[in-house]
Amino acid sequence: MDIVASRTVADQWRELARTCPDHTFLVHEDLDGRTRELTYGQVADQVVRTANLFHDLGVRRGDAVALHLGNTPEMVQCLFGLTVLGAVAVPLHPRVGAQECRDVLERVRASVVVAEPATAGMYDRGGATGGVRVDRVVVAGTGEPGGFEDLRDRRGAEPVFDEEPTSDDPATIVFTSGSTARPKGVVVTHANLLFSGIFVGWQASLRPEDRLLTTMPACHVNFQL
């Protein structure tokens, strides 16, 4: 039995946002102990605005965008925003160095990076510093003008794009650790993510009222399930 059919992550996300907008979607505690609790409805609004931001930056269906972020709500917004747009998320561990970042960006041909302040400095937008070359770096987590949150909130809450991904389209490319060889990019489709999520939910007997605690890094495939 095909339990995914032609559905995509975008389809699943929109259905959840429509049917349970007031349910808690995410509870996040940052390194300073501050806690944010966001509903499906709140995150759905941010996801569309994020997708519109990427579209305005020239990202289109099938394009790769690197996410050099830790475990933050902004990382989740970017992951879903890219899947809604039909683009491909390429998550990078916050501790990954410049050489590996350069290698990954060249291989996936990413021209846009969303980074946090601790990682943004390794990227070179003008060719003057010898850092990792990229067309555009958006810095998240500062709340400052021109940062991710500001640019996101200045976008509308209605989609400005009309292309839809298919279930066979890549949703993310996750790179292996490289412990035995050069890191390999593993292409994960919308169908792969949906099936894995359904299977894990069944295996763990998850119910709608349950809460799932994860300490996995957001760049890890297990986090994205």
Residue ranges and their predicted role:
Residues 22, 26-72, 76-80, 97-102, ...:
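Conserved AMP-binding/adenylate-forming core of the ANL superfamily
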Residues 37-41, 171-195:
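Conserved AMP-binding A3 loop
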Residues 80-85, 107, 220:
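Short hydrophobic alpha-helices that are characteristic scaffold elements of the AMP-binding
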